[in-house]
Amino acid sequence: MRCEMLRPLLLSALPLLAASTVSGQAPTPPAAQLEAMKRFDLWVGEWKGSGWLSRGGDGRHEFRIDEKVQRKLGGTVLLVEGRGTSRTDKGQEVATHESVTLLYYDDKAGRYHWNAHDLRGGTIDAEPKLVDGGFEWGFRVEERGVTVRFTIRFDEKRWHEVGETSADGKTWNKFLEMTLERQR
């Protein structure tokens, strides 16, 4: 019975689908989104570098990091893929960070979106803010009573990122720093 009810709807939509396919014209990305994403043109590419991470009293842990930033969907979305590794006490290289992020501009809301997913199953939806030479994004960790922010600055050759935490939004404590060089 359901199929019979859906049949008229599907049959009426079929000519629209066929017409858009036959016309041979590619869809045009919204101009406002394309313009907003131009801010990140220098960030697109493949990057390699190193950094450190501090986990409270556990000291600093050094790591290597590879990042790839690609334009997708006609340039309206950036796909950021990152993988960090470090060496164990026995010299074995292990993955310490792996993430996939979508960065895009919502022209209707007038803001950027940062949608990140990591190896451990974590997800973050944040609103990046433009700063001189890059952008900032962050989130609140209620159970620890802190705000976490990351500041990413980049040019044609270098990507520098700092991670910080704050309990009051005024005093910031650095827990991460990394510098990457463009590979291509």
Model-derived features: where do they sit?
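Hydrophobic small-molecule pocket/channel-lining residues, especially in calycin-type beta-barrels
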Residues: 24-184
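Bacterial N-terminal signal peptides
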Residues: 8-19
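N-terminal secretory signal peptides that target proteins for export/translocation
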Residues: 1-6
